[in-house]
C-alpha cells in the first residue's frame, strides 16, 4: 500500500503545477483518475416483476401519498442501450451501479439465471464503450423472504446469504469487473427502520440492540466478502461506501469542538474502525454500555474482520453538519434516524455561513476536503468519491433544463478534490450522484440529481424520454479537459 501511495504522489508532482493557493495546485487530474457517475438498482431499474425478480423489503413499505414507488423508477431496465449510449457521449470513464439482490436470488437462496442477463448485457456494453464497471453488491435492496424466514440481518445466517450473492457475482464477472463496493452506507441501513426490514413499532433500546446485532453481522459478511473477492479475483479492488458528514464546531468553545468530534465518532468513524481496524473504538463501546446496549462479540469473528480490511474506502459526500455541545445531564437514545441530535452529547444547528439546499442540506464543498483528509489520516487507504451531488427541483423550459445550481455545486466539490490530489491524497475516482434522474427514497421524482432528465413525475409516467441537462454538457467538458478549468 505504501508503494501505491508513493507512486500516486509522484505521478501528481510530475503532472504540472500552478501556485494560486497556499500549496502547489495541479493543473489537471491524473490520467488514471476515473470520472464517473452512479445509480442504484432499485432507484433506477424498474421492471420490478420481470425475469423472476423477487420481493425486496422496500416494496413492503406503505406508499406515501403523492410520492411514486420504485416499480418503474427510471425504467433503466428497458432503456439500457440508450442509457449506455448517453454514458459514452458524456465521456464517462466509469459507471457505478448496484446489483438487485432479488433479481439474482429472488428468495434469497436460489440463483435465478434470468436475473443475471440484464447485468451481463450492461457490463458487456460498458466495456465495449470503454467504461469501467464499478459494481455495488448491496445497496439497500434486501430480500423480503430472508426477513420473513429469520429476521434477515438479525440472524447470523444472513452472513452466508450475503456471501452467496457476493460469490455468485465474483465468479460470474471475475474477468470483467475489477472494482467492487461491498456495501453502501451500512450506517444508514441500521439506523433507518425500513432499510433493515423490521417493524416500525420497534423503538428505543429494543431497536438499538437490534441495530447493533445487524451491524455486527454486516461487518463480518463484508470482511468475508473481501477475502473471497481476493481469492476469486486476485487483481480486484474492494471496499465499502460510507457517508461521512464532517462536523464543524459552531463556536470557538472547546466543548463544541469535543461534541463535533463525538458526532463524527457516532456518524461514521465507529464503522470505519470496524472495517479497517477490526475493532470497536473505546468511545463507541462506552456509548453503548451507557445505554445498556449489550454486544455479544465473538473473538473469532473479530479476527476475521481484522484480517480482511478493505482495499479502499468509498466516500458518499453530500453535506457537513454544525455542532454544539448538549450539556443535558442525562442519557437518551437518539431514535431511528441518520441525522439527529444526541441528548447529553451534541445538537445539530444551522450555520449562517453555509447555504442550504431546497431540502435543508448544508452545501459545504470544503466538507469533502475534511472528509478526505480525516479518513485518509486515520485509515491510510486510497479513496474513491462514490457519490456526490445536488438534489433539486428541475424545470423543463422549451425542451431544456438549465441546472446552473447543480453545475456550481459539482464544480465547487470537484475543485476541492483537485486540491486534495495536489496535496497527495490518493483518490481513485469520482462518481457523481447521479447519472440520470432516479427515484429518491423519500421524495420520489420531486428531488432530481441526474445529468439526464427523465420525463416523468410522481403521478404520471409520461414517455420517460431522456433529456440532457446543461450539467451534462458541463461534465462532458470537465472530463474531456481532465478538469483543467476547475
What are these regions (language model features)?
Residues 45-119:
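Active-site-adjacent substrate/metal-binding segments within catalytic domains
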Residues 9-11:
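Low-complexity, intrinsically disordered or signal/transmembrane-proximal segments
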Amino acid at each position: 500500500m505504501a508503494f501505491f501511495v508513493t507512486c500516486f504522489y509522484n505521478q501528481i508532482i510530475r503532472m504540472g503545477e500552478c501556485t494560486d493557493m497556499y500549496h502547489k495546485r495541479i493543473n489537471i487530474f491524473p490520467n488514471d483518475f476515473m470520472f464517473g457517475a452512479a445509480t442504484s438498482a432499485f432507484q433506477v431499474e424498474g421492471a420490478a416483476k420481470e425475469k423472476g425478480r423477487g420481493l425486496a423489503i422496500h416494496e413492503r413499505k406503505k406508499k406515501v401519498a403523492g410520492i411514486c414507488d420504485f416499480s418503474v423508477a427510471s425504467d433503466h431496465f428497458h432503456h439500457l442501450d440508450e442509457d449506455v449510449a448517453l454514458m459514452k457521449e458524456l465521456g464517462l470513464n466509469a459507471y457505478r451501479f448496484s446489483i438487485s439482490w432479488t433479481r439474482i436470488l429472488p428468495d434469497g437462496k436460489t440463483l435465478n439465471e434470468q436475473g443475471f442477463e440484464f447485468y451481463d448485457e450492461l457490463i458487456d456494453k460498458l466495456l465495449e464503450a470503454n467504461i469501467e464497471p464499478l459494481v455495488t453488491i448491496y445497496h439497500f435492496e434486501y430480500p423480503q423472504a430472508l426477513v420473513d424466514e429469520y429476521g434477515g440481518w438479525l440472524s447470523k445466517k444472513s452472513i452466508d446469504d450475503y456471501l452467496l450473492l457476493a460469490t455468485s457475482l465474483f465468479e460470474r464477472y471475475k474477468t470483467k469487473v475489477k472494482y467492487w463496493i461491498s456495501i453502501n452506507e451500512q450506517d444508514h441501513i441500521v439506523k433507518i427502520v425500513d432499510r433493515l426490514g423490521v417493524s416500525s413499532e420497534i423503538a428505543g433500546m429494543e431497536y438499538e440492540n437490534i441495530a447493533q446485532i445487524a451491524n455486527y453481522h454486516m461487518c463480518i459478511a463484508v470482511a468475508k466478502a473481501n477475502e473471497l473477492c481476493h481469492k476469486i479475483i486476485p487483481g480486484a479492488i474492494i471496499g465499502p461506501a460510507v457517508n461521512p458528514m464532517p462536523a464543524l464546531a459552531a463556536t470557538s468553545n472547546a466543548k463544541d469542538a469535543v461534541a463535533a468530534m463525538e458526532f463524527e465518532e457516532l456518524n461514521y468513524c465507529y464503522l470505519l474502525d470496524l472495517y479497517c481496524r477490526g475493532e470497536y473504538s473505546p468511545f463507541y463501546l462506552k456509548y453503548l454500555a451507557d445505554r445498556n446496549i449489550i454486544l455479544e462479540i465473538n473473538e473469532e469473528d473479530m479476527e476475521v474482520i481484522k484480517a480482511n480490511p478493505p482495499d479502499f474506502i468509498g466516500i458518499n459526500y453530500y453535506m457537513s453538519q454544525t455542532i454544539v455541545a448538549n450539556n443535558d445531564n442525562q442519557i437518551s437514545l437518539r431514535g431511528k434516524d441518520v441525522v439527529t441530535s444526541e441528548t447529553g452529547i451534541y445538537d445539530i444547528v444551522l450555520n449562517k455561513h453555509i447555504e442550504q439546499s431546497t431540502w435543508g442540506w448544508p452545501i459545504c464543498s470544503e466538507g469533502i476536503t475534511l472528509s478526505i483528509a480525516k479518513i485518509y489520516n486515520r485509515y491510510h487507504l486510497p479513496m474513491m468519491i462514490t457519490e456526490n451531488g445536488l438534489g433539486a427541483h428541475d424545470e423543463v423550459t422549451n425542451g431544456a433544463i438549465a441546472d446552473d445550481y447543480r453545475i456550481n455545486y459539482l464544480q465547487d466539490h470537484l475543485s476541492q478534490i483537485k486540491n486534495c490530489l495536489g496535496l497527495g491524497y490518493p483518490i481513485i475516482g469520482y462518481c457523481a450522484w447521479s447519472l440520470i434522474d432516479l427515484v429518491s427514497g423519500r421524495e420520489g421524482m420531486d428531488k432530481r440529481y441526474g445529468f439526464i432528465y427523465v420525463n416523468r413525475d410522481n403521478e404520471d409516467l409520461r414517455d420517460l424520454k431522456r433529456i440532457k441537462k446543461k450539467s451534462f454538457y458541463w461534465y462532458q467538458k470537465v472530463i474531456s479537459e481532465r478538469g483543467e478549468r476547475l
